[in-house]
Amino acid sequence: MPRGSRKGGTVARIVVEVMLKPEIHDPQGEAILRACQRLGFGDVLGVRQGKRFELELAGTADERLLARVGELAGELLANPVIEGFAFREA
């Protein structure tokens, strides 16, 4: 089946990236940084860990659909107290 379509209509593909806010301590990122240094990757100066979601939605990536993705990300995919998010068409 061609990219961007499914039997019965168009499919929009959206990538949502969720990251801890900069002021939130990231122990997992720090552990990865220590491992990088231990393994000889001394040029790695910092690591922040996050989540990536790939959504397939019925329809086209118009203003209405992107607004719904923002609602979904803010209510389900991210914890707005400690995380921020960004999304884009894939």
Each PLM stretch: what is its role?
Residues 1-90:
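Non-catalytic terminal accessory/regulatory regions of metabolic enzymes
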